[in-house]
Amino acid sequence: MIEVRLFAGLRQGRQKIYQMETDSIKTVQDIMDTLDIQRSEVNILLINGFHQKPETPVNDEDVVSLFPAVGGG
């Protein structure tokens, strides 16, 4: 199982945490497609705490964290 954690605005209309089977999920992009999250919505993408790209492969027991761009001033 892969644990997917969504933060801030990415949670809107979605769960905070997902558990996904690795059968159909091969990359972070597959996760984003499954959750209907566009690349432009994600500013920081971590796998097990390390910065990665959407095309990075995922493995069983990985923790994927997706963060949107954060604004403020």
Provide a role label for each language-model segment:
Residues 1-72:
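Ubiquitin-like/PB1-type beta-grasp interaction modules and other compact soluble beta-rich domains
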